Amino acid sequence: MSIFTPEVNIMIKEARTEDAAKLIEYTKIVGAQTDNLSFGKEGAGDTHEVEEFIKKISSDPNSVMYFAWKNDDIVGCANISGMKRRMSHRANFAISVAKSEWGSGIGSALLEKCISFAKDNGIEIINLDTRSDNIRAISLYKKFGFIKIGQMPAFSKINGEYIDADLMYLDLREKSNNRRKIEAYERLEAIRRENKKEIDFNKEREEAMNKKHKIQP
């Protein structure tokens, strides 16, 4: 999969163990750019740890990791981590994008790839957590249908400050999709009704004003 415009040429590929060094380099960059991740400028681990992590994901039929490549550098990363046994219908999701590429569509492309993988592999529920003040990420998740189901107080601690996290999920079951369509339609109808009320109110007010002006001497 690729994102190509006159300004952007991005390739999205599945992770390989030989990409470990590039991934470490990437995590050090993004870890220094934002406090929205579980790691800082130290990155996600050493070469052995990262290679083992990629191997573990690659060997699990319900897990996947994608990298967004710009030339020879990773500028985005997302993964689906499947669960086992009675929770095998669920998976956890995580994503990060280099700050230089925010707003380029990479986040949407990575999330779309992961959702497609989940559907193809029988995953019904995708869970994620994100800082409660990470408005950009929350907006992205909502765009794809994720719903907030709770909040975890003191989810992380950075420089002595406790950070809360929103817990969100995406239900991929067909029944749920139909329910979401109905809810979206009902919200739209509610907005239309409110707009009609406002139009009717303004019309009545205008008529009253006109009537008032007519009876004045």
Which residues does each predicted region cover?
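Short linear interaction segments
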Residues: 180-217
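Conserved acetyl-CoA-binding loop-helix of GNAT-fold acetyltransferases
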Residues: 103-116, 120, 139-143
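A short beta-loop-alpha structural element at the N-terminal edge
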Residues: 11-25
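Conserved GNAT acetyl-CoA-binding A-motif
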Residues: 118-129
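Glycine-rich phosphate/pyrophosphate-binding loop shared by adenosine-nucleotide-utilizing enzymes
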Residues: 8-10, 71-77, 163
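Acetyl-CoA-dependent GNAT
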Residues: 17, 37, 41-99, 111-112, ...
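Conserved catalytic-core motifs of GNAT/GCN5-like acyltransferases
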Residues: 127-130, 142, 147-163
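Active-site acidic-Proline motif in GNAT/NAT acetyltransferases
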Residues: 95-100, 104, 132-133
